[in-house]
């Protein structure tokens, strides 16, 4: 009996080990090589597969070298921000594949194919390359299928233009506090002063999302921002290990800290949501902020079709992350560009003066700022907050003339497309807001040559929110100051999930009155 039990045990162990080895070999070698062969038979060119790591090491090495030194203002920032994708585009052409570890990713530059990917939301779904990324935020931006459709329907009322009008006073208050602090600095220095505007813009946009999302001040929401920033930094440090099987389960120092920070965020958010629910029951809850509108819309759904408390908390995390990141980077690059291009700064200020004089900006006036809108679109074109969007294929399907197998990813290279001379002309790298004088649809040869906010059914639900914030901030700044680049300004855009200024944004602010 003992021999038979031992034999069975050994047999089971051998079977499990054999199965595990086969699964690992299939994942690391056989599956990628099969997909590579399939893609090459389709006529696609790309990099040869390197087991497990793919192109990650080459990409990381090139990026590390690129961000080790700043560039000149008129240099092409793609060489610094996306050096490896740029080199692959030059080497393999406008449709090619590279490797995200063992996963082939097809980069497409054709706007018609990009449009097809955006429109077929149930076929081309969100890629989930890094399991730990869910700690930053999940919510609407990461959901697919019916869950995405349900959440989009519930959240949509919060970003209706009529609702945004009610948030404009909060935008003004938050902007005024930071602009007022800059004004004091400049006044203390006799009307002219060098300021690193980046920390102030981060604080301003954090305050705006805290007040408009939760009716709370920046100080109450500050801990959430600190924790999300810490998770972002730790996540970026771990990207090189993302394709090690089960890495996100390992109790490394970084993994433990990320999960602890996420738990703390959830405790804070659960407290905010539960407090609001109790206030609603007592008839005392505000309903004009994003959380109030979200809860009201959620309660209006038929039983079983609403969101759980956990779902609401995830959407709150997303409000914080996306609401703060997108607008802060848009504002910092707008201030840098206007400091460099004094003619457009003068035009924008003159428009603000004509619409508002020295009065407080309001919703109606912000909607009349055509020059400012052109400038913001051009900044978004040249400095998109996110440089690329990945999509995943889960079953064989057609895309244009290609037949693509399950297991392949699609890469939509926002920055490369929006600086492409074939689509935007030979002056594609130049700052020319006049491109947008007739709106987005006529700015380039193809409508889907601009997708900083994505496009189609999954277009960013908060784009009007972000643009309204940015217009308010820039109107107040231009009313109060003229801007120029400081001699100490260092041009060094780099991607930390969104496109940050690596060494801040040192500008000279001149007080106008």
From Swiss-Prot:
TM regions (residue ranges): 2-22
Binding residues annotated for heme, in chain numbering: 460
Membrane topology: Single-pass membrane protein
Catalytic activity: oleanolate + reduced [NADPH--hemoprotein reductase] + O2 = hederagenin + oxidized [NADPH--hemoprotein reductase] + H2O + H(+)
A cellular-component GO term for this protein: membrane
Cofactor: heme
Locations listed in the record: Membrane
Xref: InterPro entries: Cyt_P450 (IPR001128), Cyt_P450_E_grp-I (IPR002401), Cyt_P450_sf (IPR036396), Cytochrome_P450_Monooxygen (IPR050665)
Predominant cellular place of this UniProt entry's protein: membrane
Keywords (A to Z) from UniProt: Heme, Iron, Membrane, Metal-binding, Monooxygenase, Oxidoreductase, Transmembrane, Transmembrane helix
Annotated EC: 1.14.14.-
Entry's Gene Ontology molecular function annotations: heme binding; iron ion binding; oxidoreductase activity, acting on paired donors, with incorporation or reduction of molecular oxygen, reduced flavin or flavoprotein as one donor, and incorporation of one atom of oxygen
Protein's GO biological process: saponin metabolic process
Family recorded in the similarity comment: Belongs to the cytochrome P450 family.
Protein name: Cytochrome P450 72A552
Organism placement in taxonomy: Eukaryota, Viridiplantae, Streptophyta, Embryophyta, Tracheophyta
């Amino acid at each position: 009996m003992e021999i038979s039990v031992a034999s069975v045990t050994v047999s089971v162990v051998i079977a499990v080990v054999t199965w595990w080895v086969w699964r690992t070999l299939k994942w690391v070698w056989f599956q990628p090589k099969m997909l590579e062969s399939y893609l090459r038979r389709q006529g696609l060119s790309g990099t040869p597969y390197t087991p497990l790591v793919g192109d990650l090491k080459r990409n990381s090495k090139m990026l590390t070298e690129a961000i080790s030194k700043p560039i000149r203002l008129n240099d092409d920032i793609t060489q610094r921000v996306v050096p490896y994708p740029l080199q692959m585009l030059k080497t393999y052409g406008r449709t090619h594949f590279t490797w995200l570890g063992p996963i082939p990713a097809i980069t497409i530059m054709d706007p018609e194919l990009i449009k097809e990917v955006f429109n077929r939301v149930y076929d081309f779904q969100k890629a989930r390359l890094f399991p730990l990324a869910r700690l930053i935020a999940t919510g609407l931006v990461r959901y697919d299928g019916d869950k995405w459709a349900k959440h989009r329907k519930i959240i949509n009322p919060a970003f209706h233009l009529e609702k945004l009008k009610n948030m404009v006073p909060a935008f003004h208050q938050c902007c005024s506090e930071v602009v007022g602090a800059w004004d004091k600095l400049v006044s203390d220095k006799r009307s002219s002063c060098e300021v690193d505007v980046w920390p102030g813009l981060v604080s301003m946009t954090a305050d705006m999302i805290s007040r408009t999302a939760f009716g709370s001040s920046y100080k109450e929401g500050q801990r959430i921002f600190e924790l999300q920033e810490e998770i972002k930094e730790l996540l970026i440090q771990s990207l090189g290990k993302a394709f090690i099987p089960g890495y996100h389960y390992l109790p490394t120092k970084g993994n433990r800290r990320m999960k602890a920070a996420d738990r703390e965020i959830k405790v804070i958010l659960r407290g905010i949501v539960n407090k609001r629910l109790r206030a609603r029951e007592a008839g005392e809850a505000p309903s004009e902020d994003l959380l109030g509108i979200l809860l009201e819309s959620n309660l209006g759904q038929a039983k079983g079709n609403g969101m759980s408390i956990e779902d609401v908390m995830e959407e709150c995390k997303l409000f914080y992350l996306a609401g703060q990141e997108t607008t802060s980077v848009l504002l910092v690059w707008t201030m840098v560009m206007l400091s460099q291009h004094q003619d457009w700064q003068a035009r924008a200020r003159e428009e603000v003066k004509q619409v508002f004089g020295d009065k407080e900006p309001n919703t109606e006036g912000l909607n009349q700022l055509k020059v400012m809108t052109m400038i913001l679109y051009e900044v978004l074109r040249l400095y998109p907050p996110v440089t690329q969007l990945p999509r995943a294929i889960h079953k064989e399907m057609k895309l244009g003339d290609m037949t693509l197998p399950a297991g392949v990813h699609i890469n939509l290279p926002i920055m490369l497309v929006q600086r492409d001379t074939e689509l935007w002309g030979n002056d594609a790298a130049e700052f020319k807001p006049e491109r947008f004088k007739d709106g987005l649809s006529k700015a380039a040869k193809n409508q889907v040559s601009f997708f900083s906010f994505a496009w189609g059914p999954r277009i960013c639900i908060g784009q009007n929110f972000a643009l309204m914030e940015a217009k308010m901030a820039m109107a107040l700044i231009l009313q109060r100051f003229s801007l120029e680049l400081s001699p100490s300004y260092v041009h060094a855009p780099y991607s930390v999930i969104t496109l940050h200024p690596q060494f801040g944004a040192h500008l000279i602010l001149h007080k106008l009155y």
